[in-house]
């Protein structure tokens, strides 16, 4: 009797979610800048009233330790240190009565401040 091994390939879930809304806004901002090499860098740094805060910037350079996600032709970069705090997070863009802004829904945050710009983990 011969043994047949069945290999089942499953797609690994993405480490974070980059929404269509966020990708569309980033594409719009990159078009305004006129530099197609720009990528959105999302990072975590110390600060804020809860200990950590999120930051957003444009970057032309992808570092060796960056995690990259591309959606609708737009690239999002997260450095290795920030990655551990953002695993499972959703990076979104909201434009509603409260204003227009990038929003991070982070399941790793144990608490957030009232303004939502800082968190503790």
From Swiss-Prot:
Its cofactor is iron-sulfur cluster. The keyword Ligase does not apply. InterPro entries: FeS_biogenesis (IPR000361), FeS_cluster_insertion (IPR016092), FeS_cluster_insertion_CS (IPR017870), FeS_cluster_insertion_RrpA (IPR023063), HesB-like_dom_sf (IPR035903). Binds 1 iron-sulfur cluster per subunit. GO terms for biological process: iron-sulfur cluster assembly. Gene3D superfamilies: HesB-like domain. Keywords: Iron, Iron-sulfur, Metal-binding. PROSITE patterns: HESB. Iron-sulfur cluster binds at residues 49, 113, 115. GO terms for molecular function: 2 iron, 2 sulfur cluster binding; 4 iron, 4 sulfur cluster binding; iron ion binding. The keyword DNA-binding does not apply. Belongs to the HesB/IscA family. Homodimer. NCBIfam families: iron-sulfur cluster assembly accessory protein, PRK13623.1. Required for insertion of 4Fe-4S clusters. This is Putative iron-sulfur cluster insertion protein ErpA. It comes from Polaromonas sp. (strain JS666 / ATCC BAA-500).
